[in-house]
Curated annotation (Swiss-Prot):
The active site is at 650 (proton acceptor). The modification Phosphothreonine is found at residues 684, 837. It comes from Arabidopsis thaliana (Mouse-ear cress). The chain crosses the membrane at residues 444-464. Residues 614-631 are annotated as: CaM-binding. It is found in: Cell membrane. This is Putative G-type lectin S-receptor-like serine/threonine-protein kinase At1g61610. ATP binds at residues 531-539, 553. Residues 465-842 are cytoplasmic. The modification Phosphoserine is found at residues 559, 654, 667, 728, 830.
Amino acid sequence: MAGFNRNLTLVTTLLIFHQLCSNVSCSTSNSFTRNHTIREGDSLISEDESFELGFFTPKNSTLRYVGIWYKNIEPQTVVWVANREKPLLDHKGALKIADDGNLVIVNGQNETIWSTNVEPESNNTVAVLFKTGDLVLCSDSDRRKWYWESFNNPTDTFLPGMRVRVNPSLGENRAFIPWKSESDPSPGKYSMGIDPVGALEIVIWEGEKRKWRSGPWNSAIFTGIPDMLRFTNYIYGFKLSSPPDRDGSVYFTYVASDSSDFLRFWIRPDGVEEQFRWNKDIRNWNLLQWKPSTECEKYNRCGNYSVCDDSKEFDSGKCSCIDGFEPVHQDQWNNRDFSGGCQRRVPLNCNQSLVAGQEDGFTVLKGIKVPDFGSVVLHNNSETCKDVCARDCSCKAYALVVGIGCMIWTRDLIDMEHFERGGNSINIRLAGSKLGGGKENSTLWIIVFSVIGAFLLGLCIWILWKFKKSLKAFLWKKKDITVSDIIENRDYSSSPIKVLVGDQVDTPDLPIFSFDSVASATGDFAEENKLGQGGFGTVYKGNFSEGREIAVKRLSGKSKQGLEEFKNEILLIAKLQHRNLVRLLGCCIEDNEKMLLYEYMPNKSLDRFLFDESKQGSLDWRKRWEVIGGIARGLLYLHRDSRLKIIHRDLKASNILLDTEMNPKISDFGMARIFNYRQDHANTIRVVGTYGYMAPEYAMEGIFSEKSDVYSFGVLILEIVSGRKNVSFRGTDHGSLIGYAWHLWSQGKTKEMIDPIVKDTRDVTEAMRCIHVGMLCTQDSVIHRPNMGSVLLMLESQTSQLPPPRQPTFHSFLNSGDIELNFDGHDVASVNDVTFTTIVGR
């Protein structure tokens, strides 16, 4: 009897538990039916435990919402909100399936505040949270029959697998609307979506006003984002459904190259689109790209009929009118207000009584983001496209765009941007008088210009002949220049340098050597005198008759280090005098030959000793300490103490040369930039440097400053102390030497980073302090990095208290394959000052 009672009690308990579970979610199921209710503390979890649905409260708020977020990611990252316009005021709300089969949210009074508001075939429905983050309401008997899904009702986040519908024929689109603020999920004033009335392109609106657009889709990329061709692994994986649905609808979707990655696009409350990837190693979101990211990406930044060019400084004029146009308000343009745009100098002649030969014509602009509001006509032939535009007097321009076809513009040409790489050619309609005049006078003008051209050509040939004759005579006299002449600082500067660098700068007192004298010193560039080779050309050892050894950098005709870098090095290094900077002895400029002559460094470069196990023993701790200090003093001289404020931009182990006494000398100033002393940073489109040494703001945004050199110096410190290359950690859990340093630091094991060759030295404290300083120098944010004056003080003052470094994130991003870089040379141990790697950010 007692046993029977115990069994009865157990059965009763199970029945009660079952009844409770019919009213609340007692498991981590990914679905629920009419018999279940999601209340406070309950949640749905996707099958792979990637996403979670439940109740949440935003930061700095007391209101409650139902949303979807990434499970096990902190801080909580919400990707969808149901009741964003009608929050719950307390914790008494519930999510359930109503009697009509709709998914609803009710408050404590059982009033519906949000509903899917569809008409299911029956009320036998089920809500399922898929591993893509999509919440679906479907038939419980046939789960292939979907009635509603969150992916079709997005808030501010676009996830891989989401299909964004647009119907150009009906002018319908699906917009992503950001939160009003980080604590208020209600709809903000911005929106992002596919343009429903024009070309298939992404647009960000501020109310009804456009803020940014991507340019039309050409079946591979959005034409206004040419970088999509170079960021294929993670950043872009867009696809367009083809053919359209019966009603004309098409769908954009995004497919990640690695389905295990968490990627998300979202639009911030301030109207900026961003893309992130979750870094599992450091458990942080890596920012991959954002739009608009430059001045010229802002919508119609320069006004109508004007082109914006980010490679130019804004103060000096990023904006320029198209040929044949002029500023509407010249006084505003003089004050750098370009919003008024440009207007035609001469009206078009279409449909007017014309003088023969005065018909309108076209001028071409290349590398352009095509204007907004273009129309696509079904022609794929350039001449046919031109004829279509020429016959239409309202046509302002045309372009034949690969993947789209013939596009014409009948409205004002707006939102044009020039790209360094990529872009399209657009043909602008101009009055015939702006294209060279009428046919009646064309023969006369051809004759006149031909005569003038022939005269000028003959004059140029004569001047060039006289110049080369004088130059050869000069160089012949200089064949016997000796190194002792150089040491005595005799002035051998002459016209070739003036021709090279121009009269606008002070010409350095730099000796010029003839090609024959350099060839003689290097044994006609003998193979046995070759010291090394890189993307720039070849380096040779040379000996003058007095016995003085030199190193000769002979630039090849195909050198990536072109005339500008050659000029840069002559102008900079010839003016700099410091014991920790390499000394330039002279140059050779003859015909197509460009050569630089340096003092010879018998121990060559730091990387040969640092990363070669057979030579590491030559660098004991005392010598490494002196090398670190010498480099720091050389950098401080460049940044603060020289006549010029110079940012090196390519500081690395292979550009640190070692003399006979192993004293370090910074070399290779081909990529350096001069700042004035009130300037703290600059921008560039052409990002140059070396993989593993580039600061995040420089690699990602083209912004560089003395803090960029500080970052490179920090990497160099860590390499010197550890004896390991920064890039040797690529593909590991740490991502880079910086990540490895942080890993050991956070676990209190910094000592393990010290090179075993010097680990047993009595100066371990000194080595650990260097690691600490290196980590401070490689912090992600510019404002957190010390300047070189502070760095030198930290190194030399062993008693001062150092601030703790911040956890790095950028190092892992660079090493994850998210950024693709062009390598113009191989990363090998260099010789003397000559091997360098130029990297262009892609």
